[in-house]
Amino acid sequence: MSQRFNFDPSFLQPDSIEKATIIQKELANRICLEDEFNTPEFFGGMDVSNNLFDPKQIIYATAILLDSKMLSVQFHNSVSQRQTFPYIPGFLGFREAPALIDALESLPKLPDMIFVDGQGISHPRRLGIASHIGVLVNIPTIGVAKNILFGEPKKDLGSCVGDYVFLYAYGKEIGALVRTKLRCKPLIISTGHRVSLRTAIEYVLNCVKGYRLPEPTRQAHLAANAFRKQSQAGN
């Protein structure tokens, strides 16, 4: 499947939910929860656009590359793929990661850190899509999700931009609710791979430019939607 990345493609192609669960547990054991990277020169952003009711089950995936200082988009690449794995909460990586990794692989340069639209370890089996991708491609990743999938905060979140509270499960920190824009719902930030939670929060807040989403996932979201609309208009 991949020329740049050395991983077993079966980690993305389970033939049953039971096998998918086993894969998630195996990959979760490989996650690094500490900072294991040099200062990033380029950020990556990943998101998909699709219609769950599309009978063709086509997914439109985008990976972008941004300059880490100016947060300007340097390159972007989008791919479309027909999906065979069903939409099941908690198993998003098997549905979306294959297309996202293909989009990432075709960038002229790989990012030093990737912001993924979705959960990292804030997941029932500690392997959301950000962690799934991070472990397979071995690039530091951060999960940037819009809704809580797993875990609960122990206190209320403040109303100021930059406020955050941790999410807990089984007595451990697994993520954080982070206020990135006034009068907007917080984001759920979590470690994907090779980035600690507190560092992930810091990088997300540094990448916010007046919007709810940090620029890497915001720009990927815009590009994925534009690609889907353009592709569907041509059919």
Curated annotation (Swiss-Prot):
NCBIfam families: PRK11617.1. GO terms for molecular function: deoxyribonuclease V activity; magnesium ion binding; RNA endonuclease activity, producing 5'-phosphomonoesters; single-stranded RNA binding. It comes from the Bacteria. It is an enzyme of class 3 (hydrolase). It catalyses: Endonucleolytic cleavage at apurinic or apyrimidinic sites to products with a 5'-phosphate. The record marks Y87 as: Interaction with target DNA. It holds the Pfam family Endonuclease_5. DNA repair enzyme involved in the repair of deaminated bases. Selectively cleaves double-stranded DNA at the second phosphodiester bond 3' to a deoxyinosine leaving behind the intact lesion on the nicked DNA. It comes from Protochlamydia amoebophila (strain UWE25). Mg(2+) binds at D47, D117. Keywords: Cytoplasm, DNA damage, DNA repair, Endonuclease, Hydrolase, Magnesium, Metal-binding, Nuclease. Its cofactor is Mg(2+). Belongs to the endonuclease V family. Its EC number is 3.1.21.7. GO terms for biological process: DNA repair. GO terms for cellular component: cytoplasm. It is found in: Cytoplasm. This is Endonuclease V.
